Structures are given as structure tokens and as C-alpha cells.
């Protein structure tokens, strides 16, 4: 939402295209369409559901011997089902950009980057990221200042695919009850008087940062 508002302000609505990419069905697609309508920008819907299904079938056809031999089971790993749609979405975005002669805007922010909460070569990609240096709390302030609807700006971030919010997923991953980006943002900005994590929780956050920081580093070449 905020990146769309920034793009229209910078380039004009006639030069911005919103691309909605459900994986089959997605209940909050109406929110994306609402943003496009409010801004008066062209919108496209590219459903990646059939492509995801076809790719998965093609991959598993070549692995059936391993499944039969018990090396693999028939259950699709969570890492595949979570990250592959994100990469297909980015492929679709670059396809649209190539056809229209445009560029892909990355919508990631600093809060997500600190914890590596993105897919490598998926939603972490893009030509450039206008909000990459800002925390979720700061992005929300920018959105409100631009006049974006408060309910959309304050909406809990989620990928629209796994059925839970980013904060719920991170709370489980970090084993931190009631984890929110707002709480994390105080730590990122070193507002120590506002930080309410325990020492053990901070250590787990730092551990995850060190584990995932490869996603925001320049790729190492030989």
C-alpha cells in the first residue's frame, strides 16, 4: 500500500501498475484492488496457482524414484510451499515489467530484513526498494502522512498464502509470545527504554539475524 502511494507521488498514476498475484484463491485480494482504485492506477491479476501446481508436479515426477525408495515422502516441505510461490510472484512481476518496459519495486522494509523474513530471490528481489531503510512503524507513519487509508496502513502484514500474519509466524519461530514489529522496531532503533524483550529473547533475535543476514548481503562471487 505505502509503496504504491509513494510510486504514484513520484511517477504519476499513469506510470504505475499494481499486480495482484494470488496462488489460487486469496481472501484479502479486495484490499489490493481497493488501493489500485483509490490511486486510480491500472491493475492486473496474474493468478500463479496453475503455474505453481504444474511446476510442483513437474518437479515431483523426477523425484518419484526417491519417493518410492523412501528417501523422500510425498508431503511437500513447508520451505517449498512457502518460498516457491514468492519466487513465482517475482517472476510474474519481472515478466510484466519486461512487457510494459517498467521496473519492479521491492516492498520490503527494515524490520523484515533484520529477521530475514522474506524469500531469497522472491519478495526480497526488485530493482530498488523505496522503504527498505524504514521499520514497519516508520512505514506506517509514512503511509498515514501520504493519506493512505488507516485500516490498510495498520493492517497486520502477511503474505496472503499461509493463513497467518508475519508476526504470528515470527512469534512461533522465535518462541516470543505476543511478538510484534512495533516491539522489534524499538530494538532496531535502539530505543532501549521502550524495549520489553528479555535478554534470552534478544539473543534469539540476534541469532536469527546472524542466520538470515545473507539475504541482504551482496552475493559472493568467485
Located regions from the model:
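Short, surface-exposed alpha-helical segments at coil->helix boundaries
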Residues: 1-4, 29-33
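ATP/NTP-dependent adenylation/nucleotidyl-transfer catalytic domains that generate, transfer
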Residues: 2-9, 14-17, 24, 37-51, ...
Amino acid at each position: 500500500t505505502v509503496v504504491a502511494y509513494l510510486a504514484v507521488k513520484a511517477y504519476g498514476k499513469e506510470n504505475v501498475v499494481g499486480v495482484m498475484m494470488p496462488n489460487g484463491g486469496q481472501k484479502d485480494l479486495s484490499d489490493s484492488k481497493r488501493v489500485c482504485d483509490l490511486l486510480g492506477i491500472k491493475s492486473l491479476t496474474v493468478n500463479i496457482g496453475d503455474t505453481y501446481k504444474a511446476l510442483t508436479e513437474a518437479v515431483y515426477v523426477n523425484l518419484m524414484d526417491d519417493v518410492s525408495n523412501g528417501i523422500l515422502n510425498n508431503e511437500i516441505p513447508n520451505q517449498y510451499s512457502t518460498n516457491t510461490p514468492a519466487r513465482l510472484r517475482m517472476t510474474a512481476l519481472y515478466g510484466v515489467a519486461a512487457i510494459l518496459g517498467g521496473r519492479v519495486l521491492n516492498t520490503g522494509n527494515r524490520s523484515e530484513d533484520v529477521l530475514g523474513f522474506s524469500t531469497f530471490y522472491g519478495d526480497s528481489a526488485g530493482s530498488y526498494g523505496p522503504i527498505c531503510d524504514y521499520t514497519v512503524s516508520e512505514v506506517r507513519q509514512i503511509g498515514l502522512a501520504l493519506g493512505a487509508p488507516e485500516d490498510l496502513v495498520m493492517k497486520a502484514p502477511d503474505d496472503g498464502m499461509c493463513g497467518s500474519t508475519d508476526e504470528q509466524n515470527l512469534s512461533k519461530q522465535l518462541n516470543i509470545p505476543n511478538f510484534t514489529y512495533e516491539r522489534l522496531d524499538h530494538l532496531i532503533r535502539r530505543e532501549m527504554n521502550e524495549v520489553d524483550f528479555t535478554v534470552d529473547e534478544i539473543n534469539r533475535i540476534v541469532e536469527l539475524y546472524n542466520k538470515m543476514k545473507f539475504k541482504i548481503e551482496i552475493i559472493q562471487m568467485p
